[in-house]
Regions:
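Short loop/turn segments immediately following beta-strands, especially the blade-tip
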Residues: 16-24, 64-74, 119-126, 167-174
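A short beta-strand motif characteristic of beta-propeller blades
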Residues: 26-32, 79-87, 129-135, 177-182
Length: 195
C-alpha cells in the first residue's frame, strides 16, 4: 500500500500511498529524522512490524514499529542505537545495513573507522543490542553482504578496491577473515543469493 523514500539531504523519509489500480503515488506522511543526521537507507523486517533507518552523519540506527493503516501507516520510534564503538573517528559515516537470514542479527558497516558492527535483534520487540564493532581490513566499506548460510560476510571496500570475506562467530562475538581478498575496482553494492 505504501512506498517510503529516504531523503538524506533534508533528513526525512517521505511516505507515499501507492494506488496500484491507477499506477499513481501520493504523498501522505513525512517521518522527520534528527537534523543533519542523514538517513541513508532502511530495512523492513520480514514480518513487516519494524523498520530500521541508518543515519550516515550521526552514525546511528533508528528502530521504528510499523503498522499499515488505511490511509497512513502508523510508525513509532522505539530505539536509537550507535553504529560505532565507544571512540569513533570523527569522519565516520554509517553506510550499509543487512540482516542475517533469520533476522536474529543485524550488521552495519561504517566508513571512516572502517568497521562492521553486529547487533542481536529481538524478533518480538525489534530492539537491537550491540555485540561488537570490529575492523574489516579495507577502506570505506560502502556495502556488506551476508551469505545465505548466515555464517559469512563480505565487505565491499570502495576506496581500497577490494572485497574482504569473514566468518561470523556469533557465540564469541567476532568476525574472522576467511579466504582471500578480491581486487575489484570501487565496489559499491552486492547481493549474495542462493541458487
Amino acid at each position: 500500500k505504501f512506498l517510503m523514500v529516504a531523503d538524506v539531504g533534508i533528513d526525512q523519509i517521505k511516505v507515499y500511498r501507492f494506488d496500484k489500480n491507477e499506477g499513481r503515488i501520493s504523498h501522505v506522511d513525512t517521518i522527520r529524522s534528527e537534523r543533519e543526521s542523514g538517513p541513508r537507507h532502511f530495512l523492513f523486517s520480514k514480518d513487516g512490524k519494524f523498520f530500521y533507518v541508518v543515519h550516515e552523519l550521526k552514525n546511528v540506527i533508528d528502530v521504528y514499529s510499523y503498522q499499515s493503516g488505511d490511509k497512513v501507516p502508523v510508525v513509532e520510534k522505539v530505539q536509537t542505537i550507535p553504529t560505532t564503538g565507544d571512540d569513533p573517528d570523527l569522519l565516520t559515516a554509517a553506510c550499509a545495513m543487512r540482516f542475517d537470514p533469520n533476522e536474529e542479527h543485524m550488521f552495519c558497516s561504517n566508513a571512516g573507522d572502517n568497521t562492521v558492527s553486529m547487533y542481536e535483534r529481538d524478533t518480538e520487540t525489534g530492539l537491537l543490542n550491540l555485540k561488537f564493532c570490529l575492523p574489516i581490513s579495507g577502506n570505506y566499506p560502502k556495502d556488506i553482504a551476508i551469505f545465505p548460510d548466515g555464517e559469512h560476510l563480505a565487505s565491499l571496500n570502495h576506496l581500497s578496491g577490494s572485497i574482504s570475506f569473514f566468518r561470523v562467530d556469533y557465540e564469541r562475538g567476532l568476525i574472522v577473515m576467511s579466504g582471500r581478498t578480491l581486487r575489484v575496482n570501487e565496489p559499491n553494492c552486492c547481493e549474495i543469493v542462493k541458487l
